[in-house]
Design a protein with these regions (language model features):
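Transmembrane and membrane-interface helices of multi-pass
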Residues: 1-136
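Active-site-proximal alpha/beta segments of enzymes that process anionic O-linked groups
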Residues: 31, 36-83, 90, 94, ...
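Active-site His/acidic residue clusters
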Residues: 125, 328-374, 406-419
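Alpha-helical transmembrane signal-anchor/signal-peptide segments
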Residues: 132-147
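Metal-dependent active-site segment of extracytoplasmic phospho-/sulfohydrolases and closely related
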Residues: 158-159, 179, 374-415, 428, ...
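Substrate-binding rim/cap in mid-to-C-terminal beta-strand-loop elements of soluble/periplasmic
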Residues: 192, 197-214, 408-455
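Short beta-strand segments
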Residues: 245-247, 342-349, 369-372, 396-401, ...
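Conserved small/polar residues in nucleotide/adenosyl-binding loops
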Residues: 469-473
């Protein structure tokens, strides 16, 4: 999300003031009608409070995914039944206690329960805020779209990172059409590559830095340290490469190395009241009963729609969308600059939802294999653009994934440790070849240096003498 702790805090306090005022007004109106009705309203509020608390803390094991997968809400009818049962049981308990204890004692219990739950939630909030460092103001850098094809006639180091692409599935797609195999002529394919993390937030900083996330520090501290301590960035800087990261996720919080396409931006909501409503819905994702969660889940998109980043419309923020990347590729001319260039492009790859067919038409209900075909065609266009500009031979090119993917279980963290990895060194010319080297992302930092030194794609990992190279015809 683009917003920070202080924008959330401001919206939450305003929402709290609004709901608190409405609640006080409602209780006063109920008291004016009759004492019995006021007690009924108080009891109903207690039932709602306890139901939401149980929903948000004990009925969260079967939440719909947040990764863009299309949610079939009909599949969650069972969760609605659980919520209804909890609500009925709590209501029955409240009515029973009210009858047993009497009106005055029951009113005291309502106040005690409300204060107790409020205290628990407040302690949890403060603890999480302090331990995660969320309260600290940070500068986040965003990638602008232009300059993707401002490259060097000396040497380029280009990384195309495709999100969530499984090596074996990609290989099956390549084998299905000789044209796909021909796209990757001059490359070396590593089918036994072992990745690092199953999720993008951790794998991308690791790929670029070699620094593991041990869970002992706040994530943004880790991300900043990953940039600061990156062996790749240090080596590129020492060799005077111009470094640009085309990344749509705002995880870069350190500017130790000068990323030529990144800027610090001011952020604000377009219309504050709509943003405040969206923040309220975000809370409902966890605490609202399931029949309201579909409404609350829309807030994920709505908060992005309220993002005003104050950028020049002629140079918008970079997005990983595959079709937009292909469109921009056609629009931006290749230009040349002095010195060497490093360019990193994070693309949608095989991430859900599967929007495009093999011809990059928006269909909305495509398959994983069709999505991979679309990626291959876009990569082919990218490579052709380099060839037409006489920049292909002098470029190191890596086509890789941040992690693997299991199309049979899209939300599983398992079966994600075999990411795609294809590499071409400077000046290579041969059919697509396969290396059976037992390579791993743990070896990437040394591999990057070997590629900068002019090594071929089949000679960048240890144990090369144990490999068996197959040339794909």
């Amino acid at each position: 999300f683009w917003f920070d702790f202080y924008k959330i805090l401001k919206a939450v306090l305003q929402n709290f003031a609004l709901f608190f005022g409405l609640n006080v007004l409602g209780i006063l109106l109920a008291a004016c009608i009759s004492k019995v009705f006021c007690r009924f309203v108080t009891a109903a509020e207690l039932v709602v409070l306890l139901t939401l608390y149980v929903q948000g803390n004990f009925l969260v094991n079967h939440m719909p995914p947040f990764d863009g997968t299309e949610i079939v809400w009909e599949d969650y009818r069972g969760e609605n039944i659980k919520t209804a049962i909890v609500c009925i049981l709590i209501a029955a308990a409240v009515v029973t206690v009210a009858k047993l204890l009497g009106a005055k004692r029951f009113q005291g219990i309502c106040m005690a329960v409300s204060a107790g739950l409020s205290g628990i939630l407040m302690i949890t909030l403060v603890t999480m805020t302090v331990t995660t460092g969320a309260y600290r103001e940070r500068t986040t850098y965003y990638a602008l779209e232009n300059g993707q094809y401002r490259l060097s006639q000396d040497q380029n180091f280009l990384v195309l990172l495709l999100d969530a692409v499984d090596a074996k599935t990609f290989e099956e797609v390549m084998d299905s059409d000789p044209a796909y195999t021909e796209t990757f002529a001059d490359f070396t394919y590593y089918p036994d590559m072992v990745g690092a993390y199953p999720w993008t937030a951790f794998s991308v900083p690791y790929i670029l830095s070699g620094k593991w996330y041990e869970g002992e520090e706040y994530y943004l501290d880790y991300a900043a340290a990953a940039v600061d301590e990156s062996g790749l960035f240090r080596e590129l800087s020492e060799r005077d490469y111009d470094i640009a990261l085309y990344e749509s996720d705002p995880w870069v919080t350190s500017y130790t190395y000068q990323f030529s396409n990144m800027v610090e931006l001011q952020h604000e909501a377009y219309v504050w009241k709509y943003f405040r409503r969206a923040i309220c819905k975000l809370g409902g994702i966890r605490y609202a009963p399931f029949f309201l969660k579909e409404y609350c889940y829309r807030a994920i998109v709505q908060t992005q729609g309220q993002h005003n980043a104050f950028v020049d419309e002629s140079n918008p923020l970079y997005t990983w969308d595959l079709k937009e990347f292909a469109t921009h590729m056609q629009e931006e001319e290749v230009t040349y600059q002095e010195g060497k260039c490093f360019r990193y492009y994070h693309l949608q790859g095989g991430h859900v939802p599967f929007l495009y067919d093999a011809d990059l038409n928006t269909v909305g209900d495509s398959s994983y294999t069709e999505t991979l075909e679309a990626n291959i065609r876009v990569i082919g266009q990218f490579l052709d653009k380099l060839k037409q500009s006489d920049l292909y031979d002098n470029s190191v090119i890596i086509v890789m994934a941040d992690h693997g993917f299991d199309p049979q279980n899209e939300v599983s963290a398992y079966d994600r440790q075999n990411p795609l990895f294809l590499v071409k060194g400077v000046g290579e010319s041969h059919p697509l070849q396969t290396s059976l080297v037992p390579a791993a992302y743990e070896d990437l930092q040394d591999a990057y240096v070997r590629l900068m030194d002019g090594a071929a794609g089949d000679a960048i990992f240890p144990y090369q003498e144990l490999s068996l190279i197959h040339i794909s015809e």
